[in-house]
A protein has these predicted regions:
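Acidic, divalent-metal-binding catalytic cores of TOPRIM
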Residues: 1-148
């Protein structure tokens, strides 16, 4: 079986996760399809537990950021801060990002195009040493290999 990730659909939702997951479960019952959800914590513990209860299904993996948002987790993962600081200074001409908090705050305020550019550049030499935050890596591993 080929476990490469090459047929992925990405959808972004602000609210309504549970309804969408319930519909997805009905539509995909008995298929080999998988649903991986990466969500921001946003200081909402109840929402986190409501969504992560879907991890009981063998074809769903929900993972939540440790910190408030995705940007916070990316910047604070292992040695990512220095790599990202260099990247954003060179590629986006950002200044005043000399601490992890300043960098993640600026990134959160940036337009969606900045996140798109970053995602497209993840395979570039400039970002080859970036470590995915654990919650993202967990979902990627699930999508490739299933539950562990």
């Amino acid at each position: 079986k080929d476990n490469s990730l090459n047929n992925i659909e990405v959808l972004s939702f602000h609210k309504g996760f549970k309804s969408i997951i319930e519909i997805w479960l009905k539509i995909n019952k008995g298929t080999g399809n998988k649903l991986g959800i990466i969500r921001d914590f946003d200081n909402e513990e109840k929402s986190k537990s409501d969504h992560e209860r879907y991890n009981q299904y063998k074809n769903i993996q929900v993972a939540t950021t440790k910190k408030y948002t995705l940007e916070d987790d990316f910047v604070n993962e292992e040695n990512n801060f220095e790599i990202l600081k260099d990247y954003f200074e060179k590629e986006h001409n950002w200044v005043d990002i000399d601490t992890p908090d300043k960098l993640s705050d600026k990134w959160k305020k940036a337009k969606a195009q900045t996140m798109y550019d970053f995602c497209m550049d993840l395979s570039s030499d400039a970002l080859k040493e970036i470590k995915l935050p654990k919650h993202i890596q967990d979902v990627m591993d699930f999508m490739q290999n299933g539950k562990v």
